[in-house]
């Protein structure tokens, strides 16, 4: 369905998918005359491999008009794989989505603060995710949330405001971070829809 937005994500969207749900609510409130439906699978309990295995039912079968993907964090946190291994699974899923659909696909980068034990792993994973745009520059857009967060943090430091923590010490998003991501998604998606 042209007006259905499918969101597939992990803890990037919050412990219970708060950012995805807030984004849906913001879009419905701000665009009251736009017919839109949401299918939200965030946080997805499945691994990247399981999402790939079930892609025909859980992703392609949803018949979305737009797909937003925010994955990779859970796989890194789980351990056993570095960013190479995580991206191999991520890319396999991305290829499946791009080969079996004709709709716009948006891939989100993950802020480094969400994996404080090895932020360089997220930096490297994000660089790989950014490279996905080359697969189909008309359909694929990178929503660079990691860069957006870095810019926000820099502006906070310039102003001397330290009271707005986006993440806890162990990298979990705070309530303000979930709202921040929801607003960011709204801005990006509306820009793409117009």
Q: Could you say what each language-model-derived stretch is?
A:
Residues 70-74, 95-127:
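Active-site segments of SGNH/GDSL-like serine hydrolases
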Residues 38-49, 77-82, 170:
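Acidic/histidine-rich helix-loop elements
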Residues 114-194:
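Catalytic His-Asp segment of secreted/periplasmic serine-dependent ester chemistry enzymes
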Residues 17-19, 79-84, 116-121:
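Short, solvent-exposed loop/turn segments at secondary-structure boundaries
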Residues 11-14, 44-48, 73-77, 111-115, ...:
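Solvent-exposed loop/turn segments at secondary-structure junctions
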Residues 5-7, 37-40, 66-70, 104-109, ...:
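Structural recognition of the beta-strand scaffold that forms the well-ordered cores
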Residues 1-44, 56-63:
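Serine-esterase "nucleophile elbow" of acetyl-processing enzymes
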């Amino acid at each position: 369905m042209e007006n259905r937005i499918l969101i597939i994500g992990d803890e990037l969207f919050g412990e219970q998918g708060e950012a995805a749900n807030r984004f849906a609510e913001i879009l419905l409130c701000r665009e009251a005359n736009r017919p839109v439906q949401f299918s939200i699978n965030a946080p997805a309990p499945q691994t990247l491999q399981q999402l790939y295995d079930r892609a025909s039912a859980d992703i392609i079968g949803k018949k979305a008009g737009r797909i937003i993907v925010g994955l990779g964090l859970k796989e890194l946190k789980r351990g056993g794989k570095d960013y190479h291994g995580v991206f191999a699974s991520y890319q396999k899923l991305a290829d499946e989505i791009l080969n079996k659909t004709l709709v716009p696909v948006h891939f989100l980068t993950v802020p480094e603060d969400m994996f404080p034990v090895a932020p360089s792993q997220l930096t490297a994973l994000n660089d790989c995710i950014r490279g996905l745009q080359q697969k189909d520059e008309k359909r694929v857009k990178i929503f660079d949330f990691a860069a957006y967060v870095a810019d926000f943090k820099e502006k906070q430091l310039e102003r001397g405001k330290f009271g707005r923590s986006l993440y806890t010490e162990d990298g979990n998003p705070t309530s303000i971070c979930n709202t921040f991501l929801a607003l960011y998604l709204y801005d990006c998606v509306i820009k793409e829809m117009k």
